[in-house]
Amino acid sequence: MSDTRIVGKLISTAARSSLQPIGLARKGRSRLWYDDRGWSLIVAEFQPGRGPGTYLNVGAMWLWADRDYWAFDEGARLYWRGDGSLRTEPPLGEAGWTQHVDFLNADQFSRDVALAAEVAARRVVELRTQFPDVAAVADHLLSRATRRAESPLWHAFHAGAAAALGGDAAAAERSFAKVL
């Protein structure tokens, strides 16, 4: 069996063990798992890299924009340590953080990707807690500036949509005015 197939099987096993028990479903036979909340998705992606292994992306996708692709509107790449602690921003200048699980052999990868899947599950729970409803999304988006590499128009659109759906017409109007 090729390294790529072994990696895929081990990711599937680890994700099934950590993500399925908390309610995530797998998209077909892909490396993508999701929690459908009706108005949003929480997405966990074991992203392939150049060689055998995986990166880990976990974030929320708002469903009020009509798209035919998966997106990370809030969150994405995760960084973690061997003790399971995690960050959503690159920890510059600090040793011991990783963002990629390299495949060296099946035993090592199985152990390391199991930790990554546990980190993904913990981040999913954090996002569920952070965004229990649309009003919480609106509060969050309205209170933060547009991030680097984020489109100001998409940020304003998402803030406006969340505010409108959360019942704050004035905030929705202010946000949508930035889009038009």
Segments the model singles out, each with a brief description of its role:
Residues 5-26:
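Amphipathic alpha-helical segments
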Residues 1-7, 33-180:
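Intrinsically disordered, low-complexity regulatory regions enriched in serine/threonine/proline
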Residues 28-32:
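Acidic carboxylate-rich catalytic motifs and surrounding loops in phosphoryl-/glycosyl-chemistry enzymes
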